[in-house]
Amino acid sequence: MEKFTIYTGTTVPLMNDNIDTDQILPKQFLKLIDKKGFGKYLMYAWRYLDNQYTEDPDFVFNRPEYRKATILITGDNFGAGSSREHAAWALADYGFKVVIAGSFGDIHYNNELNNGMLPIVQPLEVRQALANLKPTDQVTVDLEQQKIFSPVGEFSFDIDGEWKHKLLNGLDDIGITLQYEDLITEYEKNRPSYWQ
């Protein structure tokens, strides 16, 4: 996993509440098994007018000024619903590095973290201020300081210490285990012969 320390990007507002994982990535696209390629299907029912991928010009992701945004500002209960990790894959493949919401579905929150994204919980007034930024305004997220720096202010956020450590060091679960490789090897050497 890529390290996440300080990230600067532009925002796109999608202030709907209760965006569930089926809206993020509909079930018909769950057959793909590689993490790459899901970005095309992100918010499929909202982004496209038909199954020929004719873009809906009124949907915010399709507006030229927001196409390169990498920080999503959204409503409460983002990622509710099923546990499909594919929804996080779609967000990451589309290019999102940070999602700022009022709250997250528990499993989806962890799926975003496991895929190197930073989900941040902020109150409505902060999200509204960020949602009203100009499309060219830069926002910086500093994980070490746990702060968001923007033209409309500086905001603190919370994150579990273990997740913070994993993101700052680019460690997934396997990477964490490999930190203890010497101890594991030593333990295996000292096991009774019938276990080896």
UniProtKB/Swiss-Prot annotation:
NCBIfam families: leuD, PRK01641.1. It catalyses: (2R,3S)-3-isopropylmalate = (2S)-2-isopropylmalate. It comes from Streptococcus sanguinis (strain SK36). GO terms for biological process: L-leucine biosynthetic process. This is 3-isopropylmalate dehydratase small subunit. One of its GO terms (cellular component) is 3-isopropylmalate dehydratase complex. Belongs to the LeuD family. LeuD type 1 subfamily. One of its GO terms (molecular function) is 3-isopropylmalate dehydratase activity. Heterodimer of LeuC and LeuD. Pathway: Amino-acid biosynthesis; L-leucine biosynthesis; L-leucine from 3-methyl-2-oxobutanoate: step 2/4.
